[in-house]
Amino acid sequence: MSKKTIANLTSADLSGKRVLVRADFNVPLDGDGKITDDTRIRAALPTIQDLTSKGAKVILASHFGRPKGQVNESMRLTPVAARLSELLGQAVTKCDDCIGDEVAAKVGALQNGQVALLENVRFHSGEEANDPEFARQLASVADLYVNDAFGTAHRAHASTEGVTHHLSPSVAGYLIEKELKYLQAAIEGPQRPLAAIVGGSKVSSKIGVIETLLDKVDKLLIGGGMIFTFYKARGLAVGKSLVEEDKLDLARTLEAKAKEKGVALLLPSDVVVADNFAADANAQTVSINNIPDGWMGLDIGPNSVKEFQAALSDCKTVIWNGPMGVFEFDKFAAGTDAVAHSLAAITETGADTIIGGGDSVAAVEKVGVAEKMSHISTGGGASLELLEGKVLPGIAALDEA
């Protein structure tokens, strides 16, 4: 899907125009209401600065947390407005609501190149319900629309889909443009060999993506808690490891499908097991054929790491979604760390590496190699759905290029 982007709009299109920008400012705060990681705010700057430099009046909208349609004082966007003011080097006008007379007055007072931030759109139940009247009110203070919130693009909400019925043009910002470029290219026309590494605890949450990837990839590497469902399906003893009993047939089907399509499906040959689920548990490395009763697998083992590294060494494109083990516990982080370092190394030799949202992003940041990847997706659910080939409502609603 080729969409019109902010790059298609000139100063003549934008000067003096009121532009509603849907951003994703859902950043983590500490107990004192201080922002602990401003990555998402910084990620929106190229779009905001492009608009202000072309003389637009920028109206920023975002959700924050899950206030469930009620005003929640701890979920106001005030800290975001303060951080944005610092990063942009100009005062950002903060509104106390996202619709109504106060918003209209503050937006009306903006000069060309100035920025206003609306209050948390989820303080109104009409946002997540995609209520047409709420969408109309939200859009009423603007002339055109830019969506730069990839993380919510898989939801049809008022600020991601509803407003596009009232504002034209409706285009993608630079963040969404980059997401589409990397994620779609990886699926539609990748440099080969193409490998996908899928981790995480449950097969059930990744079924769609694994099935789609089996039609596209040359190699599929599986780690994380979901491996034990595959082992049990093969008839192996898995101790107290996590197993989805109702997905054993599915695991067999996926293995058969990989074989039929000529996809190299790699499961770990050894695992690090623990006597309980804790950071200080006793741990040992065992072959997958020798998992002891009463123990649970919490990471892939050193032999598996070597096998995975060998499989990735000649790949030209790699998509990674989901950790190899319980990387939050240092004792069970080695597999995830090793995969992160391997991807950083092959990126240096020209491979495209795409970190597909969620826990894998936290993992590469923890290891300190985030900067070395080709692309880090800002959307967890959205990137998975795009990789599954689903249509994202927030993207579909934008103007065609």
Curated annotation (Swiss-Prot):
Keywords: ATP-binding, Cytoplasm, Glycolysis, Kinase, Nucleotide-binding, Transferase. Pfam families: PGK. InterPro entries: Phosphoglycerate_kinase, Phosphoglycerate_kinase_CS, Phosphoglycerate_kinase_N, Phosphoglycerate_kinase_sf. It is an enzyme of class 2 (transferase). ATP binds at K206, G297, E328, G357, G358, D359, S360. GO terms for cellular component: cytosol. Transmembrane segments: none annotated. One of its GO terms (biological process) is gluconeogenesis. One of its GO terms (molecular function) is ATP binding. Signal peptide: none annotated. It catalyses: (2R)-3-phosphoglycerate + ATP = (2R)-3-phospho-glyceroyl phosphate + ADP. Substrate binds at D24, F25, N26, R40, H63, F64, G65, R66, R122, R155. PROSITE patterns: PGLYCERATE_KINASE. SUPFAM superfamilies: Phosphoglycerate kinase. It comes from the Bacteria. Its main location: cytoplasm. Its EC number is 2.7.2.3. It is found in: Cytoplasm. Monomer. Belongs to the phosphoglycerate kinase family. This is Phosphoglycerate kinase. The lineage of its organism: Bacteria, Bacillati, Cyanobacteriota, Cyanophyceae, Acaryochloridales.
